[in-house]
Amino acid sequence: MPRTYVIPDLHGRRDLLDAALLRIETHAGGKEATIVVLGDYVDKGPDSRRVIARLRAGVAPGLRLAMLKGNHDALMVAALRGDVAIANWMTKGGDTALASYGGDVADVPVHDIDWLDGRPLWHMDAHRIYVHAGVDPALPLAQQDPVLLMTKRYADDDASGHDAGEGARHVVHGHDRHADGPLLKQGRSNLDTYAWKTGRLVIGVFDDALPGGPVELIEITAPPAP
C-alpha cells in the first residue's frame, strides 16, 4: 500500500532536507507516496531561503508533496508584511532567516512570502491528521483555531488523537521539541527532535492502509548547530 513520509521542523537546515528527500526517494523505490512537511521551514538554522527554494522546486515523479504552515513561517510573513514588529521576529530566530536573504528585508522576494503564507494548516488522509503543532480533539477541523494548530503544546503524557465527528484519526505533529524523541503515543506522534540544533532529523513512515503511528522511522544525521 502507499506510504506517507513525514518530515518535521527543519528551521533552515537545507542539509537535512536534502538528505531526507534523497532517503525518502530511495525508500519509496519508485512507488507512489506522499511526503508531508510539518512546517517551520525558517528561522534559527542558517539556510531558510534555500529550504524554501528546495521545497518550491518539487520532488521526483510519483511523489506528492504536502507542505504545511508552522508558527515561525506565519511570524516571518507577519513581520515582513508589517503586521508585527521586525524586532519581534528577530528575537525568535528571524535574524538567521533574514541573514540567509542578505540581511535586508527589502531583499526577501514577495514570492517567498506569498508561498509561506499560502501553506495549508493541516493535511488529512483516511487514518491521520498532519498538523504543525496539534489539534483540539473535541472540535471538527473546520472549527479549529488556526493559531492553536500552529502553537499547541501537548502535555507529554497526553495520548489524545482526534475524534470529533470525522472519524478517529491519529495526529502527527512537530513543534514541541524532544531531542531524545520522537514521542510516540496511542493517539499522536510528535516527530520534532530539535533537528536544527542537534543535527538529528527523524522521518516518520506511515502505511496509508493502517491506522495509528509510524510503521518505520528513518533517521537523518548531520553536524549539530554551533
Describe the function of each predicted region:
Residues 1-54:
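N-terminal active-site segment of His-dependent metallophosphoesterases
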Residues 31, 44-124, 151-162:
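Active-site neighborhood of divalent metal-dependent phosphoester bond hydrolases
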Residues 11-15, 43-46, 73-77, 123, ...:
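Active-site environment of divalent metal-dependent phosphoester hydrolases
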Residues 1-5, 123-129:
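Beta-strand-turn-beta hairpins that frame and shape the catalytic cleft
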Residues 7-8, 35-39, 66-70, 170-176, ...:
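Active-site neighborhood of phospho(di)ester-bond hydrolases with catalytic His/Asp-centered motifs
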Residues 124, 130-132, 203-207:
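Short, well-ordered beta-strand micro-motif
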Residues 147-220:
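Conserved beta-sheet core of the metallophosphoesterase superfamily
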Residues 129-130, 134-145:
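Divalent-metal (often Zn2+) His-rich catalytic cores of metallo-beta-lactamase-fold enzymes
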